[in-house]
Amino acid sequence: MSLRFHTLPTLPRAVKPGCRELLCLLVIAVMVSPSSSGLCPTACICATDIVSCTNKNLSKVPGNLFRLIKRLDLSYNRIGLLDADWIPVSFVKLSTLIVRHNNITSISTGSFSTTPNLKCLDLSSNRLKSVKSAMFQELKVLEVLLLYNNHISYLDPAAFGGLSHLQKLYLSGNFLTKFPMDLYVGRFKLADLTFLDVSYNQIASIPMHHINLVPGKQLRGIFLHGNPFVCDCSLYSLLTFWYRRHFNSVTDFKHDYTCRLWLDSRHSHQLLLLQDSFLNCSHSVINGSFHALGFIHEAQVGERAIVHCDGKTGNGNTDFIWVGPDNRLLEPDKDTGNFRVFYNGSLVIENPGFEDAGVYSCIAMNRQRLLNETVDIMINVSNFTINRSHHAHEAFNTAFTTLAACVVSIVLVLLYLYLTPCPCKCRDKRQKNALNQSNAHSSILSPGPTRDASAEDRKAGKRVVFLEPLKDPAVGQNGKVKLVPSKTVIAEGILKSSRAKSDSDSVNSVFSDTPFVAST
């Protein structure tokens, strides 16, 4: 006891200050580590925000996972019940949860309260038998739900209520006997659902009188192949209509659409639905309703717009009605403001405005064939005047720029041709030619060098011959050659004498004794 009493006071003095802080950190880490999140369990493989815990015989989610993961894979385990405690940690950033190939038989309310931001949930290949109401109510942003390869035989109408962002729903490989029309009509319909896979169930018929209520963009994504349909001309007409409309749900699985033709209560024969002359179904006995997407029509503000019903059932026995974006019924011979419907199905909009844009549904009802068809047509309204003035302004700017460039080019060419200044060499040459011409005229009148001139003076002087004889000399000139200095004179060279001449030396060539030599 005394030893302990004496050693405890000396312990703080024996530990250095730096080591003391390190020791405190180690103690805190050891105390917190069992309950801390962010560690990777031994049964999982972690890669930053992706965790895979597949085939590890788990019955629930490990509690020490990193809370900011975005993808969690729990496939091939033995999870059997999804309750409020099966995920002990709140994963606020988890967007993909995969729990396929487990033993899930039931899902309780609040099972996904810790994963509110899930966008993709995979519960395929389990043992679910039904989908009850409020089962997925916490998943407000869920976009993809996979429930294929279960034992589901019942879907509550409110099972998917609240999933306003759900786009894809996989229910293939279950035991459904009815087509889930509640997904498209009614209180709990899913407006964004564009893909529904109910293939390979136990659905024997399609509600033809309600399928026409499904919008065209959703109807295109319904997959029905692999179901044991009962052979019926209306079903054949429906699938043929989809096939001609190039719906991928039919064109990609053409040979998987079959039906059973019952010969008696015990024997049946399986037939391909999409084949020519199926059961000799004629157009007069077809009974069904179809819905498809039509074209996009462009209308201009204030200009009359005519929209035709893009239907395939129109003939003399067909009645047409239109439904506007505001659910207003437009019928022939009824006053509906600036709308008018003709008996051939055409819709005329007088003086359309921006408020008239939207999706218009044309419903064609064939009395002879008992066939209804609904076509959705998108009408866009734009202001053509504004667009036209804008384009006209751009065209004017382009034309003006081109014209200005042409005028500038022409002016530059004219300046180059007529206002180009003469170079100095050209000016000197002109002056020299003028000087030579004047000297040529004067040289005819100047006397030749005297005989008594010195040799140096003779060398310095230059003889010049500039005479051009007339071809027809005039009579009375004593055979003399008439000089015409005003004609063209060729000056071979004019060099002034180094000796300056006085005025007395210049005499008229007529009185000069020096003979003239005419050049021919």
Swiss-Prot record:
Name of the molecule in the record: Amphoterin-induced protein 2
Entry-linked Pfam families: ig, LRR_8
Domain LRRCT span(s) in chain numbering: 227-283
Biological processes per GO annotation: brain development; cerebellum development; heterophilic cell-cell adhesion via plasma membrane cell adhesion molecules; homophilic cell adhesion via plasma membrane adhesion molecules; negative regulation of neuron apoptotic process; negative regulation of programmed cell death; positive regulation of synapse assembly
Membrane-side (Cytoplasmic) residue stretches: 420-520
Signal sequence residues: 1-37
LRR repeats, residue ranges: 68-89, 93-114, 117-138, 141-162, 165-186, 192-213
Organism, as annotated: Rattus norvegicus (Rat)
Function of the protein: Required for depolarization-dependent survival of cultured cerebellar granule neurons. May mediate homophilic as well as heterophilic cell-cell interaction with AMIGO1 or AMIGO3. May contribute to signal transduction through its intracellular domain.
Subunit structure: Binds itself as well as AMIGO1 and AMIGO3.
Recorded superkingdom: Eukaryota
Domain LRRNT positions: 38-67
PANTHER family: AMPHOTERIN-INDUCED PROTEIN, AMPHOTERIN-INDUCED PROTEIN 2
Expression across tissues: Highest levels in the lung. High levels in cerebellar granule neurons and Purkinje cells. Also in pyramidal cells between CA1 and CA3 regions of the hippocampus and granule cells of the dentate gyrus.
Record's GO cellular component terms: membrane; nucleus; plasma membrane
SMART domains in UniProt: IG (SM00409), IGc2 (SM00408), LRR_TYP (SM00369)
Ig-like C2-type domain mapped to chain residues: 288-378
InterPro entries to which the protein is assigned, alphabetical: AMIGO, Ig-like_dom, Ig-like_dom_sf, Ig-like_fold, Ig_sub, Ig_sub2, Immunoglobulin_dom, Leu-rich_rpt
Main location: membrane
Ranges facing Extracellular side: 38-398
Positions of region (Disordered): 437-458, 498-520
Membrane association type: Single-pass type I membrane protein
Covalent S-S links between cysteines: 40-46, 44-53, 231-259, 233-281, 309-362
